[in-house]
Amino acid sequence: MQCPYCNADDTKVIDSRLAAEGAQVRRRRQCNQCQERFTTFEVVEVVMPRIIKSNGRIEPYDSQKLKRSIQLPLQKRPVTLDEQEAMISRIEKRIRQLGEREISSKGLGEVVMSELKELDDVAYVRFASVYRDFQDIEAFRQELQNIRPVDEQ
């Protein structure tokens, strides 16, 4: 690691500790040339799979696009921003755990739908109506039947 004070390449680690609840490693380093000390943080680089669109085009994963796509169906629903952020984290974790370099937009949509279904039924139906391109009231009825079986109605 290069020293930020004298730019020497010869530094040594004098202390290492976990930080940010185990998501980072904090290291105290000392330059062997100027003896200055400095702190570095080490984190895992997370690489998300690319998204294969329905037209075959491949795009990089965009967390902001995912966030926007779930904010719309959640408008005016009793879901906090913390709950939304937690859901986005779960979605991203599930996608990473697939271990694939690419995922179809359809596969991503299914993961989003399963998370929305757990979080808020109304938001789930709103998202499903756009994602599955409902054309008539019967499509809504079918989806509602999937959420709430006949014996619960």
Curated annotation (Swiss-Prot):
Alphabetical keyword list: ATP-binding, DNA-binding, Metal-binding, Nucleotide-binding, Repressor, Transcription, Transcription regulation, Zinc, Zinc-finger
Keyword Metal-binding: yes
MF GO annotations: ATP binding; DNA binding; zinc ion binding
Cofactor(s) needed by this chain: Zn(2+)
Details of cofactor binding: Binds 1 zinc ion.
Coiled coil: none
Keyword DNA-binding among record annotations: yes
GO biological process: negative regulation of DNA-templated transcription
Domain of life: Bacteria
Task performed by this protein: Negatively regulates transcription of bacterial ribonucleotide reductase nrd genes and operons by binding to NrdR-boxes.
Family from the record: Belongs to the NrdR family.
Protein name from the UniProt record: Transcriptional repressor NrdR
Gene: nrdR
